[in-house]
Structure formats: C-alpha cells, structure tokens
Amino acid sequence: VYKRQCICCVSNLDYTASAAVISIYHKICDTIIDSNFIISAFFRLVRFILKPGYKKAKLKYPNLCSGIEFYMSEQSRIENEQCTSIDHACEPTAQIMSLIAQGISDNPEDKKYLSGLGYHLGRFTYIADASDDLEKDIKNGNYNPLFLNFQDIEEAKKFAEENINMSMGMIAEFY
C-alpha cells in the first residue's frame, strides 16, 4: 500500500489537525456517556475509527491532550453538579479553546494574545450553544445554566446575547 505524501507540510496545519482530532475524540467520549444505548453504540464505532488518529495526535501533543481531557472532565463535573453560574459553566470550554489557540505560536507575546482570543471564543461558543439549545434542553430536561438562572426564556436569551456581545468585543480586542 502506497502512502501519499503531504504536498506542503506546515507545522501549524499539523497542530490544528491534531487539536481537532483530540477535541473531537473527547467530545465523542462525552457524547457516549450522555447518550442512550443506540446513539452511544454509533458513537462507539466512530470513536473506534478515530482512535488511531487520536493516539498519533496524543503522542505528538501530550500536554494539549491532557489539558483537553482535564477540562472535559471539569465540564462533566459542572454539569453533574447542575452549576447555576454561567461563568463557571463556560470556563472549561473557554480554557480548552485558550489552550488550543496558544499552541499555534511559539512566540510568548503571540501566545498571550492567542490565549485571550481562544478563551473568549470558547466563552462565546458555550453561551451561544446554550442559548441555541435552550428550548430543546428545557423540553428534554438537559442541563442548561441559562434556564437554571432565569426560568424565563426571553430573559435568558437577552442575558446570553449581552454576554455573547461582550465576548465578541473581547475577541476583537485580542485580534
């Protein structure tokens, strides 16, 4: 079997691809835990297919992998505790994105800005997802810190919009 060679190997491309594989793998593991038998069976198959790529990425970037693993377990703990603080709930996602973003550069000055950009992008992503899923989470009884705080959907959406705008402003600041 002939293995194709990379036309243009770039270390940042390798890093971002590895970061994506590591993130997706851990998200799949989380989905398996949170899902019913049929859905988890499908994701177990996906995890099995992804495992060789995950092992390769983990060997290249062990600190990134252990950081993502740690923050994913923190996210699970926060959800299991039914944490009502939006700031605490979005912190693990923000830290994961910060960790990934700062790994793009070796320059300490760049790392500082990339870390902040990644952090606020993660915060933005978590709050936007919580806002988008609000009605579905209420219907299915899933964890959603917006609903735990507000009970009124419109009030929760308004709060989310304000926080999303703040995060977008911070992203622009770090950009």
Give, region by region, the residue ranges found by the protein language model.
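Acidic catalytic motifs of isoprenoid enzymes
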Residues: 3-116, 123, 127-165, 173-175
